[in-house]
């Protein structure tokens, strides 16, 4: 019995008859799967919806020299309006920046004082309190000395839980009435590496006294390159993890989490909190339940008054420091400040993303939950290219725009040799091969840099997709021209000369895409997929159209799954599929769905249908026959 799922079978029956050689013939926003290094950001697979989210997570310091074409492509893709399914890579020995706040409670016996601060004694004769020390005994009282300190853990892990465990092991608490050291909460960066982030915590003064519970404002800040501070995020929370306000829990871990913060992660030590406030209440002689609601960070009660029998030490850390408290012990590990300087190791980490061997790497194969439309090569070495080819062959719902690198390829012979070495895994309808590289001005630094043509294609793809992926992804008619390429830097453009012959025909025959000049305008001249067979799926726009159709049907099918294969349920199932087909009908010359009624399929709980499409043809080559005819005066009657 088959497992639940939606399967698609590619049956290519669109073989194109070759033309006689004597005749010269030559919508939602897309999601790009990207892997890159960056100065900061999460290490998990992350779905990026827009350029602001990208900047929040990974920063806007897009340094090509240190992070290469992969980061630049990802940033430019979202800036153009696209979306990302992204994974930031770090060195395996990188460390997570973190800081924890520790509450230290010490029981101390001191002489009792009156409201004016004068020492009190007990008269030996009358037993009454007095400020006179003559014939009297000092009255001693028990107070709790409170000191907040900071602690950071130095270890190789991206899991805040590991840091929490390490902190718990380093602190002791001996029960009520005893001295104790209590970790209260932990802050970490959202991913490993050197961190410039800081946190600041101060009392929430927006509520009137008496308050129901003490709440605090958490500000997340970051130091800029010029030394100034930027405020990134602000949250309100309670130390007490049991507080609910308007139906919402106000604990730090509920308020600051993966859905609410793009900057930090938090952990609280709930069991230590309980022991902390109960011991503080016991030593100071205050009501335990009220103590849990008071402002313990700044030692005030529900009326805003300083709590007696609790003293905050002058050595206690100032959590309200305007410059914030730094996250410490972050490290880039082997990447250092320049991952591209350790290129072999950098590419090892990139490949682990694309071959699924990284942590949670099987996410890349989840076609139901993790949509991918395109993958743009970023001058990757051969091993990474092979991994991406295998990925798109497995998924079948996304297209790989593969470059041929930036080494050599300066002559026709160079390219012919490179083409001869292409493996069969590259010869797929899910791969489009591009032969060009050139120089552009880095949009972030203004410096001249070398990129493969897939960078420019990535930037162009977003608008092209939005305006109709059914259109050919090449040519001046659809704006696939490159006015940002610096003159004289393109590696090679094919020509047709008496000496060289028709080089373009070689590119077409081998399904290699190239750019060339038309009246000074650098234009992407083809959009072949790399499959060897010459069919309608040899054209990239046709494959992209079918993939878009597949994704929409796949998204719809789970809504109807487990409904019955008869009656109204079957009618509704068919109507849902047909409504999707209707929305895509203008993109194809013809499209129809044919339902197959088969008892064996029914018994195995399978809904089977065939979707037949014919594709719209477009003009790639123009043939004009020039006929010279006699004028009427010379015509023979």
Where are the regions that the model predicts?
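Structured, hydrophobic secondary-structure cores that serve as assembly/anchoring elements
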Residues: 1-114, 120-123, 129, 134-162, ...
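Long, contiguous regulatory modules within eukaryotic nuclear regulatory proteins
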Residues: 162-189, 194-196, 218
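Broad, structure-driven detector of short, well-ordered beta-strand segments within folded domains
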Residues: 169, 194-208, 235
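A short, compositionally biased
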Residues: 206-217, 607
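A short beta-strand signature
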Residues: 216-221, 611
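Surface-exposed loop/edge segments in extracytoplasmic proteins
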Residues: 227-233
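E2/UBC-UEV (E2-variant) core
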Residues: 237-269
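Long, low-complexity, polar/charged, intrinsically disordered or flexibly structured peripheral segments
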Residues: 272-358
